[in-house]
Amino acid sequence: ASSGTALTPDQIRLINRLTKNITVLFDGDAAGMRASLRGIDLILEAGMNVRVCTFPDGDDPDSFARKTPIDELQHYLKDNATDFIRFKANLLMKDAGNDPIKKADVIRDIVVSISKVPDHIQREVYVQECASIMDISEDVLFSTLAQIGKKELQEANKKFVQDKKMEVVKATPEETKEKVNIIY
């Protein structure tokens, strides 16, 4: 359960050792859910299958689990857990309303999450689902996915070059001569 604290990559790695499937549990607080969306992307990056379940207003995962018999709790989770695309679409579209610019931002946000999925087949299925839910063509989503991938690659290359430059700056004069092949 995401209990107001950020989910860390180390925690995700530990969970990933035990299972590839994770259900993130939220209370009904929309602001708290929006703040925790980054955790969903981290889970996706780890190659895990993520579902999301929210609880009725006034209940958080702990209070709901304490007052609900285990079989009812399992039934509730089974019936109410949804994939991350449907969850994000429902949550973020509440704010977007009929504003086309905000709707485009919601779609872009979902596609960024899809871009975190390492498995190409899963990614394609998620694109199909997003297209269906958001009523947009798959071609546009795939094009946006490609743009995101290209941008991330450019950023990774830029960071690599910057890191190499910093190695030269931090190096001793002898190491610097070696790295840039200067002969005195």
Give the ranges of each region predicted by the language model:
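Short hydrophobic/aromatic-enriched beta-strand-loop microsegments
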Residues: 1-4
